[in-house]
Amino acid sequence: QAVFSHETALFFHDLTDREPLKYTITVRTGYNPSRLQEDGFQVYTVKKDLHEIGIIAMQTSFGHSVPVYDMERTICDLLRSRKNIEMQVFQDALKQYAKRKDKNLRMLMKYAAMFHVEKILRPYLEVLL
């Protein structure tokens, strides 16, 4: 139901060295996030058909398997929410992503088109790659 996203997903993927002050999760539209917000989570909502895209399982430091959005989805989510995040965090994460051997630029551009951030993402990538 809830998927770790945004700054929290960056931390899971080692794309930032900032441990999130608040864990960030994404739920599908229609889900009542008030309990999660009361528990201290920052909650984003997304349409049901976009919610499942890019979910992978990752291990916490305690060995628990949790749902997290993949790196490519996380980058697109950050751009979609750019009014709510520090752009420096995004730029640093994108620089780290560009250095990774396991990056998938084809998938990143596919997601960027699906999430309508392609025109915003492209200039950043042209500088980095």
Can you say where each PLM-predicted feature lies in the sequence?
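Nucleic-acid-binding surface
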Residues: 1-129
